[in-house]
Amino acid sequence: MWTQRNAVGNWLLVLTAVIGFLTFIWIPQTSAECQTRSIYCYECDSWTDARCKDPFNYTALPRDQPPLMTCNGCCVKMVRHQRSPYEVVRRMCTSQLQINLFMVDHVCMMESSGNGHMCFCEEDMCNSSKNLHTNGCQLHLIPIAVAVSWLMGQLLSR
C-alpha cells in the first residue's frame, strides 16, 4: 500500500512540476508581447466624462470619443459598483498602474464583493468593449493547479 501511495504522490509531483515549467516558459512570453509594442488605449473616467460609460459608443466620431493615449503595455478597463446607479468605468493603460503584468496579462479579475472587475487586453482601443473577453490562455491552468493541489493535500494527509 505504501508503494502505491508513494507512486501516486510521485506522479502528482511530476505533473505539478511539468505544469509549473510550462507556465514559467509561456507566461513571460505573453507578458513581454504586451509590453514591447505600442497600442492605443482610451483614457477616461465616467465619473468626470460621460463618454466613458457603458455601453461605449465606439461608432462615434473620434472627436466625440474619450481621448486615446499611446500605451507601452496593456489597455485596462475597471468597473466599480457595476449594475448600480453608482457604476464608475475607468479606461487606461497599465503604465499608469503599479501592477505586475506577469500576474495579470490576459485576465479579468473580479472584485471580491462581485460588484466590479478589472480586465486587461492588448489590441488597439480594446478597452472600449463592454465585455472584455480574455483569450483563456492562462485560465485553463487554474482548475488544473487547484485539482493537483487538492489531490496532493489528500494524499499527504493520509
UniProtKB/Swiss-Prot annotation:
- Provide the leader sequence positions: 1-32
Organism phylogeny: Eukaryota, Metazoa, Ecdysozoa, Arthropoda, Hexapoda
Please provide the record's keywords in A-Z order.
Biological rhythms, Cell membrane, Disulfide bond, Glycoprotein, GPI-anchor, Lipoprotein, Membrane, Signal, Transmembrane, Transmembrane helix
Q: Where are the transmembrane segments?
A: 136-156
Identification of the protein by name: UPAR/Ly6 domain-containing protein qvr
- Where is this protein localized, as stated in its record? Cell membrane; Membrane raft
Which residue numbers carry lipidation of type GPI-anchor amidated asparagine? Answer: N127
* Natural source organism: Drosophila melanogaster
One Gene Ontology cellular component term attached to this UniProt record is: membrane raft
> What is the recorded function of this protein according to its Swiss-Prot or TrEMBL entry?
Bifunctional regulator of neuronal activity in the mushroom body, and possibly other regions of the brain, that acts as a signaling molecule required for homeostatic regulation of sleep under normal conditions and after sleep deprivation. Reduces neuronal excitability by enhancing Sh/shaker K(+) channel activity; possibly by stabilizing Sh/shaker to increase protein levels, accelerating its activation kinetics, slowing C-type inactivation and enhancing recovery from inactivation. Specifically affects the A-type K(+) current.
Corresponding gene? qvr
**Disulfide cross-links:** C41-C75, C44-C52, C71-C93, C108-C119, C121-C126
In residue numbers, the region (Loop 2) covers: 77-91
UniProt family annotation: Belongs to the quiver family.
